Each structure stands twice: as structure tokens, then as C-alpha cells.
Amino acid sequence: MLPGAWLLWTSLLLLARPAQPCPMGCDCFVQEVFCSDEELATVPLDIPPYTKNIIFVETSFTTLETRAFGSNPNLTKVVFLNTQLCQFRPDAFGGLPRLEDLEVTGSSFLNLSTNIFSNLTSLGKLTLNFNMLEALPEGLFQHLAALESLHLQGNQLQALPRRLFQPLTHLKTLNLAQNLLAQLPEELFHPLTSLQTLKLSNNALSGLPQGVFGKLGSLQELFLDSNNISELPPQVFSQLFCLERLWLQRNAITHLPLSIFASLGNLTFLSLQWNMLRVLPAGLFAHTPCLVGLSLTHNQLETVAEGTFAHLSNLRSLMLSYNAITHLPAGIFRDLEELVKLYLGSNNLTALHPALFQNLSKLELLSLSKNQLTTLPEGIFDTNYNLFNLALHGNPWQCDCHLAYLFNWLQQYTDRLLNIQTYCAGPAYLKGQVVPALNEKQLVCPVTRDHLGFQVTWPDESKAGGSWDLAVQERAARSQCTYSNPEGTVVLACDQAQCRWLNVQLSPQQGSLGLQYNASQEWDLRSSCGSLRLTVSIEARAAGP
């Protein structure tokens, strides 16, 4: 912060302080009191009468006495953060008719009396996070008809009374995450007809009653992640017509009923990662056309059927990493014209169809890392005009002529540093080389007899000065044995019938500008098939008239 701005802020803060005394251990501002003295043992009696918000942080008092704030009826917000509160006297919050926001977080109380909040008829937000609550009485919220936000995260709740939320017809947010809930009464949430966000993450739920969400027609967000759910009733989401975001990750779901998402026409985000899914039923996403983000990572999918994503024309992010996918149909992504990010890493893909990404003109990021790909078909990225982030590492790339298309594409459209850990697995003389750092001339293949433009003579059958034509007209299939010298500058590819391809990289000899006319040179070449001696002779002759 600039010195002048700091001085201005400090001056305004000092002006905000009241003229009259502030309670010991507290700081007072215009309408707010902040108390953080560890020696503060009780709620101060001399809180300024104009105070609307009071916040206690890491104070030492353990008991909140009866009508502790009785002298401050204008309070609208009371907060206790990481205090040692463990007991509330009867009517502890009495005399606060205007209180709208009450928070007690990080304390150690185990239970609450039924009438503890009975006078807080204006309360709109109640936060009781990360305490030691083990149970809640059924009538705890009976006087809180105005409540819109209720947070009970991080307690020790194992069960909830079925009529606990009966009076909360205006509640919009309910957070029950990080408790020990193992089951839910089917009618527990039925009174919450205005609820928009429900968080049940990190509990011990193993299943859900069929109608548990049956009355939540206004729900927009549902968090069910990090439980032990293994199976979902087919109609469990059937009344959630307004649902936009659904978290189901980190459960034990093994299969999904075909109709499970049939009513979720407004769903924009769905997370199914870290489950045990092996198959996705055809038509599973037929009724979720608004999906923008879909995550299926860390499952056990071996294939994805054609048409699985046929109706997801608005999808922008699709995550299929960390599965066991071995094959993808050519048209699996055909309808995903809005797709921007596609994650296919950490699968068992060995080959990709040339048209696999054909309609993905808006694709910007594609991960193919950690598969079993050896090459990519020519033209596979020709219609991906916005693709500049391509992850390829962790594949056994064969750096021959079949990789030339990918190599040239990388040189033209991506930063070489993005794939600096993408290595050649073969041929032997290029093993371990960084793919983007290669020279295109190194990406060569042996040619067939019909397209060979030179003859090979073995050392014992040739004479020095034999003629060679190094013009190779076309690259073709691999041979069975590839011989090379230790430096990798001379490579000879042979099959059982004959040697079909030769690549020689000549370096000038000391004191010479290069291999001279009418000269020859020998190399000892080795491979897993054996060894041989190669002689190359060059004889220059005058051209005819």
C-alpha cells in the first residue's frame, strides 16, 4: 500500500472510533466491537449502546450467561470464533429481538437445549460450525421461521430427528458437511421447499431414500461427495427440476440407472470422479443438454459407447482421465462443438481414429498423456484451430516417419517447453530423445522394394567404387532389424529378404570439407539381430552430352 493511502486509511479508522470508552480487551468502531483478549472471561457489560455487530475471537470465557447481551437490544450480529464456550445458560440470547446473524464456530459444546434460540425470531443466518455437537433436539429451530441460512458443518452429528427442519420453510442454504451421518430420514428435508443449496459432503452415507429430495423443487446445488454411497435409487433426483450443480465424487458408485439424470434439464455441472463406474449406459446424458462441465476421472471405464455424449452440445469441459479406456469410437465427440478442454490422460489408449477430434474447432486443451500411444494419424488436429495446449508425455512414441505429422504440428502450434518430457521409445537409436527437439530428418521409415531407389551390396560381394543412389522416393513400413553405429549417424534397416533403407549423416573429416568424390568409407553396425560391416562408395563421373 502506498504511504499516502496508508495514512488516509489510518486516519479514517481513527475517525471511526467512538469518543466514549471501549470495553477492556476490545476495539470499538462506529457500529462494531471486536474483542480478542485471551483474558476476557465474560461478555463485557459496557458495550457501547450503538453497537450492531460484536465479534469475539479466542477469548477464554466458557459460559454464556442468561441474557448476556440484554443491555444491547440493537445488536444484529454476534460472532464467537475459536472461543472456549462449552455451556449456554437458559435464555443466553434473550433480549436480542433484532439479531439477524449468529455464529459460534470452533467451540467445544456438546449439545443445545431446545429453547436456546427461542427469542431470536429475526434470525436469518445461524452458523454452528466445527463444534462438538453430537445431537440436536427436534424442536431446536421451532421459533426460527425467518432463517434462510443454516450451517452445521464439522460437528459429530450421527443422526437427525425427522422433524428437525419442520419450521424452516424459508431456508435457502443448509450445510451438514463433515459430520458422521450414516442415514437420512426420508421426510427430513420435505419442509425445505425454498432450499437452494444442500451440502452433505464428507459424511458416512451409504445410501439415500428414494424420496429424500422429493420436495426440494427449488434446489440448485447438491453436494453428496465423499460418502460411502454405492447405489442411487433411480428416481432419487426426479423432482430436482432446478438443479444446476451436482457433486457425487468420492463415493463407491458402481453403476448408474439409465433414468438417474432424466429430470435434470437445467444441470450445468456434474462430478462423478473417484467412483467405481465400469460402464456408462447409452442415453445416460440424453436429458441434460445444459451440461457445461462433466468429470468422470478416476473410475474404471474401459470404453465409452458411441452416442454417450450425443446430446451435450453445450459441454465445455470433459474429464475422462485415470480410467482404463482402451478404445474410443470415431464419433464419440462429434456433437461437442463447444468443447474447450478434453482430458484423456492416464488410460490405456493405443491408437486414435483420424476423425476423433474432427468437430472440436473450439478445443484449446487436450491431454493424451500416460497412455500407450505410439503415433497419431495424419490430419488428426487439422480442424482444431484453437488447440495450443497438448499434453503428450508418458506415451511410448515411435519416432519414425509416421510421427512426422505430429512433430510438424508441435513445431508450428505449441511451445516446445510444453512437451519437454515427451520422449521417443523407439527406434533404438532415438530412444530417450525429446520429441519436440528432434530434427525432422530423423523421423524416417524403411521403404519397400518397389519404392527403393538404390541397391545394397554386402561388403564381401561389393567392390570399392560401387555406385549408390541415396534418393528414397517414399517412406513405408518398418523392418525387422535396424543396424546402427554407436553414434547413431549411420542406420541400415533390413528384413529377412534384403536391406531396404539407409540413412547416413556425414561429418567433415579433419582437414577436409567433407567426403570427397571418388571416395569410400566403412562402418561397423550392430543390432539385436547381429552385426555387419557397411561400405559406402561414391564415384563421380562426368555427365553425358
From Swiss-Prot:
Glycosylation sites: N74, N111, N119, N228, N266, N348, N359, N518
Intracellular or extracellular location(s): Secreted
Gene label: CPN2
Protein name per its UniProtKB record: Carboxypeptidase N subunit 2
SUPFAM superfamilies xrefs: L domain-like
Cellular component terms per the entry's GO annotation: blood microparticle; extracellular exosome; extracellular matrix; extracellular region; extracellular space
Domain spans labelled LRRNT: 22-49
Presence of keyword Disulfide bond: yes
Species: Homo sapiens (Human)
Record Pfam families: LRR_8
PTM note: Whether or not any Cys residues participate in intrachain bonds is unknown, but they do not form interchain disulfide bonds with the 50 kDa catalytic subunit.
Classification via SMART domains: LRR_BAC, LRR_TYP, LRRCT, LRRNT
Keywords: Disulfide bond, Glycoprotein, Leucine-rich repeat, Repeat, Secreted, Signal
Residue spans of the LRR repeats: 98-119, 122-143, 146-167, 170-191, 194-215, 218-239, 242-263, 266-287, 290-311, 314-335, 338-359, 362-383
